[in-house]
Amino acid sequence: MATDWLGSIVSINCGESLGVYQGRVSAVDQVSQTISLTRPFHNGVKCLVPEVTFRAGDITELKILEIPGPGDSRQCGDLQQADTGIPGVGCQVGPSQNGTGKMLKKPFSSSAPQNIPRRTDMKNQDIIISPQQQCSKSYMDRHMETLSQSKGFRRRHNSWSSSSRHPNQVTPKKSGLKNGQMKSKDDECFGDDIDEIPDTDFDFEGNLALFDKAAVFEEIETYERRSGTRSRGTPNEKPARYRHDENILESEPIVYRRIVVPQNANKEFCTDSGLVVPSVSYELHKKLLSVAEKHGLTLERRLEMTGVCASQMALSLLGGPNRLNPKNVHQRPTVALLCGPHVKGAQGISCGRHLSNHDVHVILFLPNFVKMLESITNELNLFSSTQGQQVSSVKDLPDTPVDLVINCLDCHENAFLRDQPWYKAVVDWANQNRAPVLSIDPPISEMEQGIDAKWSLALGLPLPLGERAGRVYLCDIGIPQKVFQEVGINYHSPFGCKFVIPLHST
């Protein structure tokens, strides 16, 4: 009796923990009380193993989905422990319709097996089934029945709203030649029954490997070349139309060395964009400023331009808009400005005036001298009109660290100032304050007791500064291009859209 069920397609429910398995019966062992399925599916997903074996104790419900062989006579009923080794397991069959369209149910004894009629006979007679355990139709019949029901649901879907509101009204059927033609077209497209369901999945990778994409693309390209048309995705071809931000003309090669000095530079720098900026000697730089002054770039203009560029750099070093905004008025940055009695000191005073105008607390140190330069006197008169503080003694400088120290103590002409007591005291204070130092136009020579700067700002063209100058920046003080040419420098501005740019050592 157990061998009669071999080849049947069944569905085994093993409870919530193990789930539902479907497959074809390959073996039924009455001794060990097991049943085996080949090509199993677990909860609708194909299993990786070719065969699965179940014990009778794990099975909650067993349903027969399809009995093999349309001409074979199979028996279906309660599979008793003596026959199949699986006690209390039945099979289900979908309801068969008789002449009245109703399903007849009749309980039967679980001790006696019951014959299952042939498929041809099942269509014309009612099946006597158990009220709790039912034998289902074949898998193909149930699938076709589902398709027919779904078709009927689609046809009735459009009249759902009217029928639900007026249940007694019947929607009139549309008639006419046009509707009949449409119905026949629908039947031609959707009315065919499914003859067979393929058992194997479609091999996408294998069929994709058969497609020679290179040959197809070559054929398309050859056809388009002959017909004169061009595809948008064809490589190595320029588009016929350009976007609004594209240049039609080919750009010339980039020249990175645009500044040429008459003598070999001891040191070269480069900008962020890669432009080479050579350094110049102190004598050439002094000559450049002298010629510019003859052309109208006076000392007052140069001091003003230097003060603006240096203050812009200092403001960015202090934090820029993140530090200097109305929400931080209680945290004004403090800058200590150390100036000597020379032109470079006047440049620092001009920078301090602009910083004070931008709500920065500036403490200006300038030693007392009997006679001052006119440029220093003029800058001090302007600085005194601001809220900045001027001191002449190191004792008046703050004991706590400041936000920034601006160094304008050194120059090339007055080297003897380094031996003065006030100079040494100021240098010691700056080194002990532990604040970052910005040097404006520092000299070339290394000083024994100088202040190590973190940043240095050069004017026009940089000098060959040493390592103690820190990171070098370059500012534009407005020297015309013809002035550079007059001193023998082939010059092209490296600043772009900025007045202060960083330089990198090459």
UniProtKB/Swiss-Prot annotation:
Disordered: region residues: 99-118, 149-188
Alphabetical keyword list: Cytoplasm, RNA-binding
Top-level division of the source organism's lineage: Eukaryota
GO cellular component, one term: P-body
PROSITE patterns reported in the protein's UniProt record: DFDF (PS51512), SM (PS52002), YJEF_N (PS51385)
Keyword RNA-binding: yes
Location in or out of the cell: Cytoplasm, P-body
Gene Ontology molecular functions: mRNA binding
Residue ranges occupied by any YjeF N-terminal domain in the UniProt entry: 281-485
Matches recorded under CDD domains: LSm16_N
GO biological process: one example: deadenylation-independent decapping of nuclear-transcribed mRNA
Keyword Cytoplasm: yes
InterPro entries on file: DFDF, FDF_dom, Lsm14-like_N, Lsm16_N, Sm, YjeF_N_dom, YjeF_N_dom_sf
Region listing for Required for interaction with DDX6, in residue ranges: 189-294
Coiled coil (residue ranges): none
One of the Pfam families matching this protein, by short name: FDF
Ranges where the DFDF domain occurs: 190-226
Ranges where the record places region Required for P-body targeting and interaction with DCP1A: 1-79
Ranges where the Sm domain occurs: 1-68
Family recorded in the similarity comment: Belongs to the EDC3 family.
Role of this protein: Binds single-stranded RNA. Involved in the process of mRNA degradation and in the positive regulation of mRNA decapping.
Free-text comment about domains: The DFDF domain is unstructured by itself. It assumes a helical fold upon interaction with other proteins.
Name of the protein: Enhancer of mRNA-decapping protein 3
Top-level taxonomy: Eukaryota, Metazoa, Chordata, Craniata, Vertebrata
